[in-house]
């Protein structure tokens, strides 16, 4: 949520930045109109209340002097009725303004590239060499089926499309990746480990920006009004909802493994095969709470933490700075990490690392004090995938496959796999 003072005092500047996002400005313009009406009502209400106070004193004086005060009393009855009417209208306008404010996205940081589509995202750097195969490589869904480590068919029978059973060494590979990522982030990168709830309430989804605008993308448990989490970002960020943190306790850095649940509304026909776009998938998340002046340095470090996973797995990747049109609702600046997937002959997103500045903190009321007794300020929040597990498995299967249909295990994972170096075709 944006600072309402920013909208009031810098309306045209904010409008231009939202235009750079490609936003429909209808709601934003409505905010300006309603806020102007609100200020007019406040001026009238305060004038009437001042008048009522003055006339009330006059009425009291008339009564003390045993003079007729009926006309003044009638005048104040009319004024009182008008104040009640104005107060009702003010409350209605405030409710509308709050709803509009919740629907306005974050303002892009000045370093975010201005663009009209994903084609305008800017490549920052690449790492690793894309492998050249001397045989026809298989897609990960075929590799997983042939190796008997992924079962999409029975998952579709048990649940439906966009689900998978991990089996045998496939399940063990997923578990190895989880442990490797959590160990790396907690032991070397300084994150505190968490295992969060997989269901959250409406206030939590609102705090991180999924609600009210993106409710159709979430899975709702209607009987309880709980949502299955789309990412561990939601419960971990809301861990500090309504908290006032101490400055000396910042930054707070958390890493959390969780299952994630997404309806993928609007994704019909996209990535229908394999692990790239599932309704349920596992992910290791990185979340930080920092002082405002530290947030952009923190974003670079967080992004590097996510990159380190790919470097140690020796998977080729690139980093993109996302343009204003591809920034997402809550971010002021965002980097995407894309890993090379041979079956797509392209890089595919495996992590997003974002600085939300105070956008989420205002919605969730997460603050800190610089000194005891000082006025609380909003923290800046950041998060990133460190990494998405299904896409990491897909990248390993495809990039580490051999001509005989087997898949080599990355060296960094072999210790987590009990020394297993290769997944071979069943005999």
Swiss-Prot record:
SUPFAM superfamilies: Class II aaRS and biotin synthetases, tRNA-binding arm. GO terms for biological process: selenocysteine biosynthetic process; seryl-tRNA aminoacylation. InterPro entries: aa-tRNA-synt_IIb, aa-tRNA-synth_II, aa-tRNA-synth_II/BPL/LPL, Ser-tRNA-ligase_type_1, Ser-tRNA-synth_1_N, SerRS_1_N_sf, SerRS_core, tRNA-bd_arm. L-serine binds at residues 231-233, 285, 385. It is found in: Cytoplasm. It catalyses: tRNA(Ser) + L-serine + ATP = L-seryl-tRNA(Ser) + AMP + diphosphate + H(+); tRNA(Sec) + L-serine + ATP = L-seryl-tRNA(Sec) + AMP + diphosphate + H(+). Coiled coil: none annotated. Keywords: Aminoacyl-tRNA synthetase, ATP-binding, Cytoplasm, Ligase, Nucleotide-binding, Protein biosynthesis. Pathway: Aminoacyl-tRNA biosynthesis; selenocysteinyl-tRNA(Sec) biosynthesis; L-seryl-tRNA(Sec) from L-serine and tRNA(Sec): step 1/1. One of its GO terms (cellular component) is cytoplasm. Its main location: cytoplasm. GO terms for molecular function: ATP binding; catalytic activity, acting on a protein; serine-tRNA ligase activity; transferase activity. ATP binds at residues 262-264, 349-352. Its EC number is 6.1.1.11. Consists of two distinct domains, a catalytic core and a N-terminal extension that is involved in tRNA binding. Catalyzes the attachment of serine to tRNA(Ser). Is also able to aminoacylate tRNA(Sec) with serine, to form the misacylated tRNA L-seryl-tRNA(Sec), which will be further converted into selenocysteinyl-tRNA(Sec). Belongs to the class-II aminoacyl-tRNA synthetase family. Type-1 seryl-tRNA synthetase subfamily. Homodimer. The tRNA molecule binds across the dimer. PANTHER family: SERINE--TRNA LIGASE, SERYL-TRNA SYNTHETASE. NCBIfam families: serS (TIGR00414). This is Serine--tRNA ligase. It comes from Listeria welshimeri serovar 6b (strain ATCC 35897 / DSM 20650 / CCUG 15529 / CIP 8149 / NCTC 11857 / SLCC 5334 / V8).
